[in-house]
Regions:
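Structural preference for solvent-exposed beta-strand-turn elements
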Residues: 1-448
Length: 448
């Protein structure tokens, strides 16, 4: 960390401050927000989006789609208006597309560009530039796109799309919704049928939303349980009015906070409960968490409910590795819940966490240990021996946990802090803005 970066860092000590009460609403779902902008930009006509997550990642997507010809504006009521260019209508961007910290923007937009006759350069921040893009480069190269990447298949990279691209049948070697989505999006402007075979189901927002925008998309389940997803290319997408449900990954922090802090009784409104995303809530219920669904409803093809969460004594469990793809981003906050549970929680099958915004396995072990938790790191997970419901000791004066520019680690340790005796010092709260700009103010209002 350079001294210049140190001057910019925003440390904060998060401390206990009473129970969480009342009703809160978390910002819109990040996955759905990204895809609303991208698909709206490929439709012909005006797509209107209410409840868009206005975090830095989604704004990176909006800036990139503008650079490729879409008109995207936000009105005073907070509604976003996207005037699309049509599938096949993307224009060559005049400058490099800056992806900031957003792996989702990068991988999905690479898919879009791959089947258009344009060349685009993708750049990102220090954290994103360490993340592997090879898993997307491989299938898109097979479709005919050409790549000049930094060593290890990383950013900055330049992609020259091919139109017409070659339709492929691609079996995912690793469970990744981003790789699946990149290939399906490339398939939109590719003649014929593009097929993705997914051995383990991952989040399915792309499939739901592509269908919602009018793409011809089918999903079949093979004898071995794999999902076979086909999209017919040269599609015409129709503009949509989209109401973005609350992000379950953001709701997760408040759900765990209310479970851990004595006396809490909190309603988190309008939470998206897509089954490929909401496994954390099932795991917390298995641990004994009181999480009740109120007013379950369907919004734009996505299941939504209000969650009433009450303080509960949790019990450690062995987490079934089969749920990993449905809660891959929620393990950092699950580790915090486990640290205050009664008994031992064992997690396995988490190799994917080592290549997220940071190595989330080792970063969470180090951070939780500083906060006084008992944690053992394994090759593919953590083993956590909980306090039995007592608050964590917290970090010593002058000691702060290292967030590695990772928003989920910063927010997870903030929640550990409000469930600790002396608080937890977080070295830098700036990364939180990538996914949840109002996190800190919402935390204050829930404890008011």
């Amino acid at each position: 960390v350079s001294s210049h970066d140190l001057a910019q860092m925003r440390p904060r000590r998060f401390t206990a401050n009473g129970p969480l009460k009342g009703r809160i609403r978390v910002p819109g779902d990040k996955s759905i927000s990204h895809r609303s902008i991208m698909l709206g930009a490929l439709a012909v006509g005006e797509t209107r989006v209410t409840g868009l997550l206005e975090g830095e990642d989604v704004l990176s997507t909006a800036a990139a789609m503008r650079a490729m010809g879409a008109t995207i504006t936000r009105d005073d009521s907070g509604m976003w208006h996207v005037h699309g260019v049509g599938v096949g209508g993307l224009l060559q961007p005049q400058q490099a597309l800056d992806m900031g910290n957003s792996g989702t923007s990068t991988r999905l937009l690479m898919g879009l560009v791959a089947s258009h006759p344009i060349t685009a350069t993708f750049v990102g921040d220090a954290s994103l530039s360490k993340r592997p893009m090879g898993r997307v480069i491989d299938p898109l190269s097979t479709m005919g796109a050409e790549f000049t990447a930094s060593p290890g298949g990383r950013l900055p990279l330049t992609l020259r799309g091919l139109s017409p691209a070659v339709p492929i049948e691609y079996r995912l070697p690793v469970a990744s919704a981003q790789v699946k989505s990149a290939v399906l999006l490339a398939g939109l402007n590719t003649p014929g049928v593009t097929t993705v075979i997914e051995p383990i189901p991952t989040r399915d927002h792309s499939e739901r939303m592509l269908r919602g925008f009018g793409a011809e998309l089918t999903v079949d389940v093979a004898a071995d349980g794999a999902r076979i997803i086909k999209v017919r290319g040269e599609a015409e997408l129709k503009p949509q009015d989209i109401v973005v449900p609350g992000d379950p990954s953001s709701a997760a922090f408040f759900v765990v906070a209310a479970l851990l802090v004595e006396g809490s009784d909190l309603v988190v409104e309008n939470v998206g409960l897509n089954p490929t995303r909401a496994a954390l809530f099932d795991v917390l219920r298995l641990m004994g968490g009181s999480i009740e669904e109120l007013d379950r409803r369907d919004v734009g093809g996505e299941p939504v409910a209000d969650l009433r969460v009450r303080h509960s004594l949790l019990t450690g469990i062995d987490v079934d590795p089969a749920v990993v793809p449905s809660m891959v981003d929620e393990f950092p906050i699950l580790f915090v819940a486990a640290a205050l549970a009664k008994g031992r929680t064992v997690t396995t099958g988490l190799e994917e966490l080592r290549v997220k915004e940071s190595d989330r396995i080792s970063a969470m072990r180090a951070a939780l240990e500083l906060a006084g938790a008992t944690v053992t790191e394994t090759e593919d997970g953590l083993i956590i021996d909980g306090t039995g419901g007592d608050p964590l000791p917290g970090t010593a004066e002058g000691t702060s946990v290292v967030t590695h520019l990772d928003h989920r680690i910063a927010m997870s340790l903030a929640i550990a802090g409000i469930a600790s005796k002396r608080g937890v010092e977080v070295d830098d709260t700036r990364p939180i803005a990538t996914s949840f700009p109002v996190f800190e103010s919402l935390l204050e209002s829930a404890r008011a």
